[in-house]
Swiss-Prot record:
Its EC number is 2.4.2.-, 2.4.2.22. It is a peripheral membrane protein. GO terms for cellular component: cytosol; plasma membrane. It comes from Photorhabdus laumondii subsp. laumondii (strain DSM 15139 / CIP 105565 / TT01). It comes from the Bacteria. Keywords: Cell inner membrane, Cell membrane, Glycosyltransferase, Magnesium, Membrane, Metal-binding, Purine salvage, Transferase. 5-phospho-alpha-D-ribose 1-diphosphate binds at residues 37-38, 69, 88-96. This is Xanthine-guanine phosphoribosyltransferase. Purine salvage pathway enzyme that catalyzes the transfer of the ribosyl-5-phosphate group from 5-phospho-alpha-D-ribose 1-diphosphate (PRPP) to the N9 position of the 6-oxopurines guanine and xanthine to form the corresponding ribonucleotides GMP (guanosine 5'-monophosphate) and XMP (xanthosine 5'-monophosphate), with the release of PPi. To a lesser extent, also acts on hypoxanthine. Pathway: Purine metabolism; GMP biosynthesis via salvage pathway; GMP from guanine: step 1/1; Purine metabolism; XMP biosynthesis via salvage pathway; XMP from xanthine: step 1/1. Mg(2+) binds at residue 89. GMP binds at residues 69, 92-96, 134-135.
Length: 153
């Protein structure tokens, strides 16, 4: 990955609220299935904005910090996804999204961010991201003190 796209907590909440507006009316949904771990925070934000209390998870492992690795389904919510929103933070190459589509063929699959290779696999997303860009999510970062330039002389 050559570029990095840094996401702040404020940006994430704004994007999640935009996505929630597109998911109205709320009465059409039975619940949310968040893809662990990237979809956990967006799932919580959507649950709050839509007033949805039924939240479950599907646990799929495909990343090890900066590297993609073999896909493993560790745990899944029951059913075919009918009436459920499945949410992840992003769709990248489409590997995880393809697995989600196979597990939950009737779900409405959404992400906050989408890269070109994975876009066709989601029903909706908010932000386009170039394929060669790594997304730094706010839960993966910490705030640190940076001394003024004049002190580094």
């Amino acid at each position: 990955m050559s570029e990095k796209y840094v996401v702040t907590w404020d940006m994430l909440q704004i994007h999640a609220r935009k996505l929630a507006q597109r998911l109205l009316p709320v009465e059409q949904w039975k619940g949310i299935i968040a893809v662990s771990r990237g979809g956990l925070v967006p799932g919580a934000l959507l649950a709050r904005e839509l007033g949805i209390r039924h939240v479950d998870t599907v646990c799929i492992s495909s990343y090890d910090h900066n590297n993609q690795r073999e896909l493993k389904v560790l745990k899944k919510a029951e059913g075919d996804g009918e009436g459920f929103i499945v949410v992840d933070d992003l769709v990248d190459t489409g590997g995880t999204a393809q697995a989600i589509r196979e597990i939950y063929p009737k779900a409405h699959f959404v992400t906050i961010f989408a890269k070109p290779a994975g876009q066709p696999l989601v029903d909706d997303y908010i932000v386009d991201i170039p394929q060669d860009t790594w997304i730094e999510q706010p839960w993966d970062m910490g705030v640190v003190f940076v001394p003024p330039i004049c002190e580094g002389r």
